[in-house]
């Protein structure tokens, strides 16, 4: 009998999974030149800065503030070795050190650092470190703190500094490069930016959008205004995804995008190293990013932050306009192209246009509102928490029937899996297994039997901060050709109906369906009015449905560019007026059209449409009509809490963080 001693057991090596966050963007600290407005320069950053200064951002608002003077900085030590700079890149800084803004917190932290050094020098065990131990160390270090709040703040600082679980960030992060004054050119660059942003009345734009936000609920708030879709020199329109995200006041996203500001965040980090409360959530989002984004043609970190701040400014102006009913874009306002050029390095495949747009908008402020627990594909007993911007639903990879459609509701919200090939969190109902590739050995998020799947709610793997977003992949040929906005290619859209719930209940909190972006495959207005002309399955564009206080409202910017759409829209306007006067019974609609008073109303509405203007009430839909369109054509679903109840459950610091 042969011996088995020579038999070698081959060890199976799996590829590294993408669940562990590794932040490194492979960029230089600062570029070869300083950026300033210059339309003749081939630099993308300079070109965008030039667009910001071409005309005033806003014509009224707060008065200009004096630029903050920079601190005098000691000369760098020329004897510093290369090893010191490498060591600095690997250093981590506790986020609490940056978000604390008051002097008493700064002094308190200095005392806490002294206590930490004392404990580390003596190799003390802090597992059972109490207030009594803290007071004893303070007495030895001659630190006098008697108030209860101060003592517990000190204890928190000490334990946070010595704990490996505290939230920290590497100094190689672009914001930390600015915070630590890593290069003399950074200060020179920020001085040039002050000359760029001040003439454009930048502070007025910030103050106005923040004031507008306090009084805004959804687009019905602006129902007394005339909505404009075209101007003489306008060349585009506000993208429907922007209307879906900012046409309704969404919790957490509003705090980061409207209350927060990327440019002032950079200034505060560099000048005073203290961040104001308005920028708390933006700062936390940015410093806890899993991976950076890269802008095409930009090769250094500081320039990337400047470009990000410029895009944030353009988005802010777009938000201001769309909430005033201004839906057209001029050349200096076109932000879509800049968003389409962002490279998301954590994605292993080219995104479809709508996913690219959604991911880019959210990545500008690092918005990831959902924290989901995902099982490690190679270690089933290892469950990790992963923050995500949105959850992906892929109908083409699921087997469905008329009696068993894809259902997004409170019972299926916890059915999630991680796709290692794309680095995305996938919606995976228990009765519709997600068919991944061989390299993506997906397993159930919480492996339980289908008969007891209701137990998922008890140990919820989904924690949501105000807003939850779904992205539905309906393109049937997404991996063949992409980039409709550049190539003119039209994808085939899968219009298989889905069961979409009006509300989700997550951890006892109700999240309502606030908005939906849908694929436009035909002239939907004429189709809804009874005509079957123009129906097909090819993508022509997008439209948005908002659920406002006055009912579902449709934003369809492409409807003004077709005669058939304009005629159908006029009919829709007249029907809404008829329903307003006579209820939902349309039996006498055509007799009503022949009345003299109706003809005058029709002429007024026709004149408005000829000038590409409408009233808010002209585009209202019935709830049944809206849900039918969403069921067949939705590509983005936005669920959120009502904003005021969201604030009521938060403390003053949690509102910003």
UniProtKB/Swiss-Prot annotation:
Reported function: Major component of the virion core that undergoes proteolytic processing during the immature virion (IV) to mature virion (MV) transition. Essential for the formation of a structurally normal core.
Removed propeptide positions: 1-61
Listed Pfam families: Pox_P4B
PTM remark: The precursor is cleaved to a mature protein during virion maturation. Proteolytic cleavage of major core proteins P4a (A10L), P4b (A3L), and VP8 (L4R), which occurs at a late stage of core formation, is required for production of infectious mature virions (MV).
Entry coiled-coil feature ranges: none
Keywords, alphabetical: Virion
Lineage: Viruses, Varidnaviria, Bamfordvirae, Nucleocytoviricota, Pokkesviricetes
Similarity remark: Belongs to the poxviridae protein P4b family.
Protein name as annotated: Major core protein 4b
Cellular localization per UniProt: Virion
Major subcellular location class: virion
GO CC terms in record: virion component
């Amino acid at each position: 009998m042969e011996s088995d001693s020579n038999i070698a057991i081959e060890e199976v090596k799996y590829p590294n999974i993408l669940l562990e966050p590794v932040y490194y963007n492979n960029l230089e600290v600062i570029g070869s030149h300083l950026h300033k407005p210059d339309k003749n320069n081939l630099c993308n950053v300079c070109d965008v800065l030039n667009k910001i200064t071409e005309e005033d951002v806003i014509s009224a608002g707060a008065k200009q503030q004096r630029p903050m003077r920079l601190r005098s900085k000691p000369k760098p030590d020329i004897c510093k070795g290369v090893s010191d700079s490498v060591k600095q890149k690997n250093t981590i800084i506790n986020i609490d050190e940056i978000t604390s803004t008051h002097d008493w917190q700064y002094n308190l932290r200095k005392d806490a650092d002294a206590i930490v050094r004392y404990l580390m020098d003596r190799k003390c065990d802090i597992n059972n470190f109490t207030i009594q131990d803290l007071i004893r160390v303070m007495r030895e270090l001659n630190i006098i703190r008697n108030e209860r709040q101060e003592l517990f703040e000190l204890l928190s600082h000490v334990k946070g500094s010595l704990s490996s679980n505290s939230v920290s960030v590497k100094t190689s992060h672009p914001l930390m490069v600015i915070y630590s004054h890593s290069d003399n050119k950074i200060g020179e660059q920020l001085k040039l930016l002050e000359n760029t942003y001040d003439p454009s009345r930048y502070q007025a734009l910030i103050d106005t959008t923040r004031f507008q936000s306090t009084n805004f609920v959804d687009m019905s708030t602006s129902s007394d205004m005339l909505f404009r879709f075209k101007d003489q020199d306008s060349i585009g329109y506000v993208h429907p995804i922007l209307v879906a995200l900012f046409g309704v006041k969404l919790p957490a996203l509003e705090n980061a995008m409207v209350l927060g500001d990327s440019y002032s965040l950079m200034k505060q980090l560099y000048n005073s190293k203290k961040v104001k409360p308005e920028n708390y959530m933006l700062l936390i989002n940015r410093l806890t990013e899993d991976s950076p984004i890269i802008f095409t043609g930009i090769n250094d970190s500081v320039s990337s932050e400047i470009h990000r701040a410029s895009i944030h400014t353009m988005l802010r102006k777009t938000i201001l306009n769309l909430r005033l009913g201004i839906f057209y874009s001029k050349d200096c306002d076109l932000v879509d192209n800049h968003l389409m050029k962002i490279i998301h390095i954590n994605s292993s495949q080219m995104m479809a246009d709508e996913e690219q747009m959604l991911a880019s908008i959210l990545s500008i402020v690092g918005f990831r509102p959902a924290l989901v627990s995902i099982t490690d594909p190679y270690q089933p007993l290892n469950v990790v928490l992963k923050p995500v911007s949105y959850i992906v639903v892929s109908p083409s990879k699921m087997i469905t029937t008329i009696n068993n459609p894809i259902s997004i509701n409170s019972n299926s919200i916890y059915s999630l899996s991680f796709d290692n090939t794309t680095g995305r969190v996938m919606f995976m109902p228990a009765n519709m297994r997600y068919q991944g590739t061989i390299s993506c050995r997906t397993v159930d998020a919480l492996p339980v039997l289908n008969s007891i799947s209701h137990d998922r709610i008890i140990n919820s793997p989904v924690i949501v901060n105000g807003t939850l977003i779904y992205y539905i992949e309906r393109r049937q040929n997404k991996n063949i050709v992409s980039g409709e906005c550049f190539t003119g290619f039209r994808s085939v859209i899968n219009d298989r109906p889905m069961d979409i719930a009006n509300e989700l209940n997550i951890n006892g909190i109700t999240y309502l369906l606030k908005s939906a972006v849908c694929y436009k495959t035909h002239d939907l207005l004429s189709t809804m009015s009874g005509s079957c002309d123009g129906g097909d399955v090819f993508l022509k564009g997008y439209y948005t449905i908002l659920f406002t206080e006055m009912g579902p409202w449709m934003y369809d910017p492409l409807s003004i560019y077709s005669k058939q759409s304009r005629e159908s829209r006029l009919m829709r306007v007249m029907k809404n007026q008829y329903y307003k006067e006579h209820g939902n019974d349309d039996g006498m609609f055509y007799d009503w059209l022949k009345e003299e008073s109706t003809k005058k109303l029709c002429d007024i509405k026709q004149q408005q449409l000829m000038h590409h203007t409408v009233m808010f009430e002209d585009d209202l839909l019935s709830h049944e009509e809206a849900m039918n369109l969403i069921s067949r054509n939705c590509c983005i679903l936005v669920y959120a809490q009502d904003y005021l109840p969201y604030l009521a459950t938060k403390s003053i610091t949690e509102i910003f963080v």
